[in-house]
């Protein structure tokens, strides 16, 4: 067992996603059975008592890999020396709130967290943002952490990616492990574009295997894009366990690398690839190695895909303009 634990900070740690996520992290789902983990858990003051209860449960699991837990409400204390920060906590949209209100409320949270990460996180920090609106929250945190390389920030579109794989497997009768090269483009919102035109089912082009453009356009894409709303409708609460699982998947692949011959979807800072304006945090197909990601290049984008990428990118640009006007970036 490696001597030095990975210091993992989790925000919103007493929330629904946090509750599912912490036990995955502590059990070794992130880096396997040989690397201990130290959890550093951030919550707002009113939730600290509930978080103490979660820590009691973590203690009761006697996880061999869990080397320590620290909790608190001060990001400068909790992020101190963190190697990985998973920003799960965010202000949910309440009754009567406009989207601009949501952006402003979360802006304050992610501004403070970005500044704290900039001051006290470890030199090798990687920051994954799960709390919504994830792409723009990541942009705000990144903009407030000028000393951390911009490539170290990513927003979660892995849940959408996993949802897309599951739907394609169901349609084709394949196993999820048979499906490679799935891509989510754009925003983690209803405008996202799940793209199967470069995906493969057992090495064959997925769109050709499906052979049904109507299903792709009118069933697959809206099912993936609106899956979160469907889960709320069915269970009366938002998807938490699946979001925690995707958060773990995304962090693991970022740190340990993607398999040969495959890629994953991550929302990362655009360099202008595929016509996505530079500086937006948008989902792309990426490969990862040694903690760094690279956008997959050279994919052909047809008119059908182009219009959908442009639509979700326009929404991201609108969100960036809104938080710029609010003075958050």
UniProtKB/Swiss-Prot annotation:
Q: Which residues bind substrate?
A: 93, 99, 132, 163
Q: Which reaction does it catalyse?
A: (S)-malate + NAD(+) = oxaloacetate + NADH + H(+)
Question: Per the UniProt entry, what are the Gene Ontology biological process annotations, in alphabetical order?
Answer: malate metabolic process; tricarboxylic acid cycle
Q: Identify the residues that bind NAD(+).
A: 12-18, 106, 113, 130-132
Single GO MF descriptor: L-malate dehydrogenase (NAD+) activity
Q: What intrachain disulfides are recorded?
A: none
Sorted UniProt keywords: NAD, Oxidoreductase, Tricarboxylic acid cycle
Catalytic residues as annotated in Swiss-Prot or TrEMBL: 188 (proton acceptor)
The organism's superkingdom is given as Bacteria
Enzyme kind, highest EC tier: oxidoreductase
> EC number(s)?
1.1.1.37
Short name of any one Pfam family annotated for the protein: Ldh_1_N
What SUPFAM superfamilies does this protein's entry cite? LDH C-terminal domain-like, NAD(P)-binding Rossmann-fold domains
Q: Which family does it belong to?
A: Belongs to the LDH/MDH superfamily. MDH type 2 family.
Described by its record, this protein's role is as follows: Catalyzes the reversible oxidation of malate to oxaloacetate.
Full protein name: Malate dehydrogenase
| Organism from which the protein derives | Mycobacterium avium (strain 104)
Q: Which gene encodes it?
A: mdh
């Amino acid at each position: 067992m490696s001597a030095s634990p990975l210091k993992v900070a989790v925000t919103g740690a007493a929330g629904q996603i946090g509750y599912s996520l912490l036990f995955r992290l502590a059990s070794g789902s992130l880096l396997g059975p040989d690397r201990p983990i130290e959890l550093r858990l951030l919550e707002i003051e009113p939730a600290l008592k509930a978080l103490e209860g979660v820590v009691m449960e973590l203690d009761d699991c006697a996880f061999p890999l869990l080397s320590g837990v620290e909790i608190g409400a001060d990001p400068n204390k909790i992020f101190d020396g963190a190697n990985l920060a998973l920003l799960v906590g965010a202000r949910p949209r309440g009754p009567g709130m406009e989207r601009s209100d949501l952006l402003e409320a979360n802006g304050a949270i992610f501004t403070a967290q970005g500044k704290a990460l900039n001051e006290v996180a470890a030199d090798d920090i990687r920051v994954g943002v799960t709390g919504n609106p994830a792409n723009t929250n990541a942009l705000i945190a990144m903009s407030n952490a000028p000393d951390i390389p911009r490539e170290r920030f990513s927003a979660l579109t892995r849940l959408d990616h996993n949802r897309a794989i599951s739907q394609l497997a169901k349609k084709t009768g394949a196993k999820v492990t048979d499906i490679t090269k799935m891509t989510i483009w754009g925003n983690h919102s209803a405008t996202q574009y799940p793209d199967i035109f470069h995906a493969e089912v057992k090495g064959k082009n997925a769109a050709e295997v499906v052979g049904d453009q109507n299903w792709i356009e009118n069933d697959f894409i809206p099912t993936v894009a609106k899956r979160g709303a469907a889960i709320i409708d069915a269970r009366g609460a938002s998807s938490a366990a699946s979001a925690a699982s995707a958060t773990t998947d995304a962090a693991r692949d970022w740190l340990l690398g993607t398999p040969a011959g495959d890629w994953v979807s991550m929302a990362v800072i655009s360099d202008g690839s595929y016509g996505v304006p530079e500086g937006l945090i948008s989902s792309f197909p990426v490969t990862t190695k040694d903690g760094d990601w690279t956008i997959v290049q050279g994919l052909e984008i047809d008119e059908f895909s182009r219009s959908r990428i442009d639509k979700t990118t326009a929404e991201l640009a609108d969100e960036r303009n809104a938080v710029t006007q609010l003075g958050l970036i």
